[in-house]
A protein has these predicted regions:
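C-terminal motif of bacterial Sec signal peptides marking the signal peptidase cleavage site
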Residues: 18-21
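Active-site-adjacent helix-turn-beta-strand microarchitecture at beta-sheet edges
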Residues: 89-160
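Short glycine-rich loop/turn motifs
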Residues: 116-118, 170-175, 243-244
């Protein structure tokens, strides 16, 4: 009898563990204490390890496609290029964004991209998720929830660095991160090798980090301070007109 009860208890425990693993690791913003973050963006200028960290205080996120959010839209507190753009085209089409993506609660088919090793998704409420690996089911779920999502190269997942070091040359790199249960955008302060940027991120120790598109033109981005003043992180450049998508945080 004891053996039977023990076996039953073991099966129940294993089933619970399996269900827990299948759910993924969503983060719920509503459980976080944001009292120490002034609206709408806090900049943590971490000069010591060569990073600038932007913490948007937001109520919603979307992947805006086709036209960059206007600086006159006072509801926007931060926006930056997210997924890769496949080709330099004069006209916008969702198929020119690398990887399937969700914008405004609708899933779109994008171009194939072997570098998209993970994804980020916002579920349209207070929860988000970073994924390492296949993310098609995640996009279906987030579209059904009215959220947003896009694929990119995962750098760090669950605190572990993901290899290979696939970028060449020096650049001012950027990543979307989760740090201490909060979303932030992390930029290298100077031009560095990708390997150096990963090392800086490892020292910053986020739970998750997902690459964001950068380079001259692609790095044009901006944020709004608590007085409503817009600050451009990088100016408009020749190739900025080819940008296709922007992760956008709304107050």
């Amino acid at each position: 009898m004891k053996s039977t009860l023990y076996s039953l208890a073991l099966l129940i425990a294993l089933a619970a563990l399996t269900l827990s693993c299948c759910k993924g690791n969503k983060t719920d913003q509503s459980t976080m204490d944001n009292s120490n973050i002034p609206a709408p963006v806090m900049i943590d200028d971490t000069t010591v390890n060569g990073l600038t960290v932007y913490y948007p205080q937001f109520s919603s996120i979307d992947l805006v496609c086709g036209t960059m959010p206007s600086q006159q839209d006072t509801n926007v507190v931060f926006c930056a290029e997210a997924a890769f753009t496949h080709e330099l085209l004069d006209e916008f089409d969702h198929s020119n964004i690398d990887g399937d993506h969700v914008s405004g609660g609708k899933r779109y088919k994008g171009a194939k991209c072997k570098d998209n090793s993970g994804a980020f998704a916002w579920f349209g409420d207070t929860t988000w998720e970073f994924v390492n690996g296949e993310y098609s089911e995640l996009l279906d779920s987030v579209a059904a929830a009215g959220g947003m999502g896009f694929g990119q190269a995962i750098i760090i997942h669950d605190g572990e660095s993901i290899r290979p070091l696939w970028r060449e040359g020096t650049n001012r790199y950027r990543a979307l991160c989760e740090k201490d249960g909060r979303l932030c955008i992390v930029d290298s302060r100077d031009e560095v090798t990708y390997e150096r940027f990963v090392a800086l991120l490892e020292a910053f120790a986020p739970t998750h980090a997902l690459y964001m598109d950068m380079g001259a033109g692609w790095n044009h981005s901006w944020w709004r301070n608590s007085d409503g003043k817009v600050h451009e992180i990088h100016p408009v450049a020749e190739k900025s007109r080819y940008c296709t998508n922007w992760i956008t945080f709304y107050k």
